[in-house]
Amino acid sequence: MKKLLCAVLSGIMAFSTFAVAVPITASAAESQESVSATYGDFEYEINDSSVAITKYTGSAETVTIPSKIAGYRVAYIDQYAFYACTNLSSIVIPNSVTTIGWGAFSSCTSLSSVIIQRGVINIDGDAFYGCSSLSNITIPDSVTEIYERAFSSCTSLKSVTIPNSVTSIGNAAFSNCVSLSSIVIPNSVKSLGHDAFENCTSLSSVIIMSGVTSIGADAFYGCSSLSNITIPDSVTEIYDGAFSKTKWFDNQSDGVVYAGKVAYTYKGDMPKNTKYC
């Protein structure tokens, strides 16, 4: 009887040990799905085996974002991670990063140098909004979309290189960039969002390569220096006010104004007894 009892107890203990071991392993795996921690001046989260920088707590002027933290690839700069870091003057974004999040560097008013290495795919809305010291930016040819207001109100921005990988430029993406003097829209871009370059008052030359089909409302509204614009035959839609308050429009003769092959608008007074369709 004692032997039988010992055998039963041994079996129960063995089963209990096995039953406890499985949940511990599962729990450890689950805990790795979302882990928050700190690495130097970076707060971060681990999600799906990659790192998102959620906040920068330092005050350095020059920052290089690491490509790996805790053995995981740094893939995402979270929304407002560097918001209003007014001491920050230079940032290097490594090729491990695929997304620069919403407002990530907005209102970094001293930021004058940005190096974005090839790897970034999306530059989200307001990413560099109000970076008033930023004078030039080279966007790598891994980027496919520039979202709304991504570089809006970068008032010192004089030069932008848009690569032949970008397919759309979002609403107000470069609005109020008052120092920007020229821009080339590559043939990979299909659409310019509304207000895309609104109130870029120094913008005097715009070259839109064949491939663009749609120019949004007020896209170049208030670009008071804009006198030279090349519009390809690929453009089939130009929305209201796209070229209002530009030198180019002011120099057009009264009557139907064509932008490329599109009858953009009618300038001046319509003839009497004109019937509208």
Language-model segments: which ranges?
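Intrinsic disorder/low-complexity segments enriched in polar/small residues
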Residues: 3, 31-34, 80, 118, ...
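Structural signature of tandem-repeat unit edges
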Residues: 41-49, 58-76, 86-99, 109-122, ...
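Sec-dependent signal peptide cleavage junction
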Residues: 15-36
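Condensing-enzyme catalytic core mediating Claisen C-C bond formation in acyl metabolism
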Residues: 52
